[in-house]
Amino acid sequence: DAVVSRGLGDVYKRQEITTDDVLTIVKEALNKTIKTSFEDFDLDNLSIYNELTPQSEEIRAAVEDDEDQGAGDQGIMVGFATNKTKSFMPPTFDMSRNIQKSLWDLQNSDEMLDLDSKVQVTSGGEKTKVVVSTQHNKAIDMEKLFHEVSEIVSNNVESEFELDLNPSGSFVKGGPAGDTGLTGRKIVVDAYGPSVPVGGGAFSGKDPSKVDRSAAYAARHLAKNIVAHKLADDCLVRVSYAIGKAEPYELTIDTFDTLKVEPGKLNDFVDKFDMKPGAIIERLNLTSVDYRKDTLFSHFGHADRNWEKIENI
C-alpha cells in the first residue's frame, strides 16, 4: 500500500510486490495526479521510504502450487451487474462516474483547477441531487465554474437535478497538502457505490494471488455475463475462500427475483466459470494487466478490461 502526505513530506510504500523501480513509479503517479505549478507539493524534494518486504513464506507456500493454487487470504468477495445501464453498473454510480470523467477533463485543461475532486449522486426524491467538490485556485470565478459543472451534470443526468458545488464554500488546499492519502480508503468508490454490498478488502496494492482482487474481478465477470446473457436483470455474486484452499467455500447467486430461466439452467451456466484462484488468474490473464488503469473511476464497468468481457457461451 502507499501513504502520501505533505505533512509527513514522505511517501511510504508497503507492498508484497517486488520491484526495483519504486522511485520512478511513485513520481510518475504523483505527476499524473498533482499539478506541481498549482499544488504546494515539491516532487523534486520528495523523501521516499521504500519498505518493500518479501512475502511471508507461509503465504507463498500456500499460493505457489501451479496445479491447484490456493487463495492468498480468506475473504468473501462480491460481484454485481444490472441491465439498467450500458455499463452494467448501478445507475447512480454510473452517473457519478460519467460526471467525474468529464470533470477530470475540465480539471486537466483549466489552469484554475487542480485534480482533487469528488462527485456524489443520489436519487429517489423529486430531483436527483448532485454534490461536486473540486479543488480550485483562489482567484477562480465561481459563477463560471458553477455554469461549467452544471453543464457537465446536465449531460450525464437525464432527470431534473439539484447541484451543490463546493458546499464548504472554498476548496483551495487539496491533494496531499490537504489530506493524507492511503491506498484502500475508498473501496466503495473502487467497486459499485453504496447500493451494492462491499466484500473483501481493497483491490489495489495486491497481486492477483490475493482473492480480494482476483475473486472480486471474477465475481463481476460472472455477474455481468449472467445479466448480459439475459438470464436475469440484476445479479449479485458472492464467493468465499479460506487461505491456502483452492476451492471456494461458498458461491451464491442472488438475482433479486429477476431470474428469467429455470434455476437448473442458471446453475449450468455458473458451472462454466471456474472460481478457483489459479483458474481465475489464467482465464482473466491477471498477470498481464496494467493495473494503473484501475486507479481511476472504479475497477469495474470499463469495456476494455478482461473481467468485463461478455463470453460467447
Map each language-model feature to its residues.
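Single conserved hydrophobic/aromatic residue that forms the stacking wall/gate
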Residues: 1-12
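Short, hydrophobic beta-strand segments
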Residues: 10-14, 129-136, 250-255
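Glycine-rich and small/hydrophobic secondary-structure elements
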Residues: 13-30, 80, 84-87, 214, ...
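Glycine-rich, mobile lid/loop segments that gate access to catalytic sites or pores
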Residues: 24, 28-174, 296, 301, ...
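Flexible helix-coil linker/hinge segments at domain or subdomain boundaries
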Residues: 37-38, 107, 156-157, 206-210, ...
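Alpha-helical support elements that line or immediately flank enzyme active sites
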Residues: 81-101, 206-230
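Glycine-rich anion/phosphate-binding loop at the beta-strand->alpha-helix junction
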Residues: 140-226
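Internal helix-turn-beta structural module
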Residues: 234-313
